[in-house]
A protein has these predicted regions:
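N-terminal, active-site-proximal structural segment of metallo-dependent hydrolase catalytic domains
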Residues: 1-80, 90-94, 99-100
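Short helix C-cap/helix-to-loop transition motifs enriched in small/turn-promoting residues
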Residues: 80-87, 111-112
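A well-ordered secondary-structure block
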Residues: 101-119
């Protein structure tokens, strides 16, 4: 996990962090053929650990990779005890298929989300 701080002209601090969540998926969900799904206990441990890391970072914007299920990211964020206005994982609202997605967790208002998949 890598935090970065930006100070704008108004002397306002914005903290941005990025993290690879290593196949964050709901329990009992098969995400790769050669990988066993998370058992409920493993899922809980992973989300608790991620929540603790998110709390430590306390970022205004958190960009994450390897999310299979939007609900799994939402749960991990809740474990942090922090309040975010948006937890977004375009393409994984009902579970990503074939490949994990990226997510955005932010305290800033989000007006619109547009996924670019033509590459």
């Amino acid at each position: 996990m890598c935090p970065m701080q930006i100070i704008n002209d108004n002397n306002t601090l914005l903290t941005v962090a990025t993290a690879n969540l290593l196949n964050l998926a709901l329990p009992n969900r098969s995400y790769y053929e050669n990988r066993d799904p998370y058992k409920p206990v493993q899922y809980e441990e992973k989300c608790n650990w991620l929540g603790a890391q998110f709390a430590r970072l306390d970022a205004d914007v958190l960009a994450v990779q390897e999310v299979w299920d939007a609900d799994a990211l939402k749960y991990a964020v809740r474990q942090s005890g922090l309040h975010y206005s948006s937890v977004l994982v375009p393409g994984a609202e009902n579970g990503a298929q074939g490949t994990p997605r990226v997510g955005l967790v932010t305290r800033l208002p989000v007006k619109q989300v547009h996924s670019i998949d033509l590459f």
